[in-house]
Amino acid sequence: LSEPCFALLVIFLLGVIFNADSTFFKWTTHRDMLRQSSVYGILACGMTLVIITAGIDLSVGSILGFTAVMFAILSIYQEWSPWLSIPACCLMGTLLGIISGVFIARFRIQPFIATLAMMVFARGMAKLVSSGMKVSPWFQQSDGTSIYREPSIFGFLDSNILQGNLAMVTLIFAICLLVSWIILSRLRIGRYIYAVGGNEEAARFSGVPVVLTKIFAYGMCGLFSAIAGICQAAQEHQGDPEAGTFYELSAIAIVVIGGTSLMGGRGGILLTLIGTLTIGYLEKILSINAVGESSRLLLTGVIIITAVLLQKRRK
């Protein structure tokens, strides 16, 4: 049994032990946990691709916030069809990711610096286009009354399917996992991603298009961030320019706890799924037992440090 799987099993058993009222045995508990973790999991899918290339992306939370605001503006104010607003927001996120990738791969800027700059830029754009205000479906009428006019796509993306047993956002997360798995396991670009992360110079001498591979990884990370932003806006029923703040830390934590190496070249999307479930169940168990947020953050930090130390020992 691998260390990430063992950690997930331990946390699951703790949930069983410390919930005498049987709350943990109800499917709604697991459904809600998956719903709450799915946005972080979608971000972690993109982060996995980047980290396997031995990179990092600090901008995912800000891109999420920007695309959440843009999706709300296009859907609520501009009344765009979802068939236009969703692809437009996905394109915006992808372009921001590609820009980061170009600076990193072509201009040899450190990933930390390049994505830190993009993090600030995207957050600034989110506040600029929204004037620093939440984009809400509430409209003020001339007579002073307010009406609530929410786009149907918000309700659809925030709904439950399969007779209420599965959240739509969880299905979207599953699709993102599948796409990421296909990229890493079934496509040539996936082999390139592992090669670049394992030894960039050796990969370059072997004919691997290192620059394009890195740009692809960061572009996909931007795309997944946009998808997460769309889901976040639908869940909150508004576009918040502050949405996604510090989400990049959660995404990195999921990838690291799952077992993907921060040094690059090793890891996989199934490990990211394990990391998502581990963090999700940990948060849910602590929430059920009324553990404060400060204690939850401390415990999560300890788990991350432990995961990194285990990686170093295994290496």
Q: Locations of the language-model features?
A:
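Transmembrane alpha-helical segments in multi-pass inner-membrane proteins
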Residues: 218-219, 224-225, 235-301
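Helix-loop-helix "hairpin" substructures at the membrane interface of multi-pass membrane proteins
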Residues: 81, 85-86, 95-100, 104, ...
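Helix-loop-helix hairpins and the membrane-proximal interhelical loops
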Residues: 1-38, 230, 234-239
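Structural signal for alpha-helical transmembrane segments and their membrane-water exit/capping regions
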Residues: 9-25, 53, 129, 180-188
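Single transmembrane alpha-helix segments in multi-pass membrane proteins
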Residues: 12-16, 26-78, 103-109, 253-255, ...
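Alpha-helical transmembrane segments within multi-pass membrane transporters and channels
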Residues: 79-119, 274-275
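Transmembrane helix-bundle core of multi-pass membrane transporters
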Residues: 112-187, 215-216, 236-241, 291
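Cytosolic-side transmembrane-helix boundaries in multi-pass membrane proteins
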Residues: 1-13, 198, 205-212, 282-315
